[in-house]
């Protein structure tokens, strides 16, 4: 009789482990809300100043053209004799130096190269979204490579820009969480 009971239980699936699914993927609407947070960060002066439509970086909270006629150069690191790292060192200077001192980053100050400018300035949300997720227009990066880029010291600088500069208005973790939500929702564009 015990054998019959075991066979019946096995046939009913009683011996199968219960299956659990992980959290549901975010909806398209949740992805769109998350992208608005991403867009807010990317189009803040801390980010867009190095992602202009032209070949000269912008500077300041008002995104004015960079002084000294600084140019992108052949690799996005400035022109010969006027590379970005000529003035921008490996760290932010002490606040005791006052305002308007060139900020720094340990992975070297630079812009995207001229062949892949990745423009953030003036892009409507839909165009910005499509550009970001298109490897043909974003430096050849897939979503994973873009996410890795978000952890670079130069990107993180936006939240610690040094004395006299406004940081990105969205908390860094909130931005990263929004990026993940947008990605998991399938990178929908507005």
Give the residues covered by each predicted segment.
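C-type cytochrome heme-c attachment and multiheme electron-transfer modules
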Residues: 36, 45, 92, 99-190
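The canonical Cys-X-X-Cys-His
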Residues: 45-54, 81-92
């Amino acid at each position: 009789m015990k054998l019959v009971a075991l066979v019946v239980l096995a046939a009913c699936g009683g011996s199968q482990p219960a299956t659990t699914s992980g959290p549901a993927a975010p909806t398209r609407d949740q992805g769109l809300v998350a992208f608005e947070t991403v867009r807010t960060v990317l189009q803040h002066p801390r980010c867009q100043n190095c992602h202009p439509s032209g070949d000269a970086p912008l500077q300041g909270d008002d995104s004015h053209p960079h002084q000294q006629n600084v140019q992108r150069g052949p690799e996005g690191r400035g022109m010969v004799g006027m590379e970005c790292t000529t003035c921008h060192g490996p760290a932010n200077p002490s606040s005791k130096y006052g305002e308007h001192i060139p900020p720094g980053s340990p992975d070297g100050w630079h812009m995207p190269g001229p062949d892949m400018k990745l423009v953030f300035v003036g892009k409507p949300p839909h165009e910005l979204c499509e550009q970001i997720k298109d490897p043909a227009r974003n430096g050849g990066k897939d979503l994973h490579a873009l996410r890795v880029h978000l952890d670079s010291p130069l990107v993180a600088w936006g939240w610690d820009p040094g004395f006299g500069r406004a940081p990105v208005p969205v908390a860094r973790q909130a931005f990263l969480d929004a990026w993940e939500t947008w990605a998991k929702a399938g990178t929908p564009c507005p």
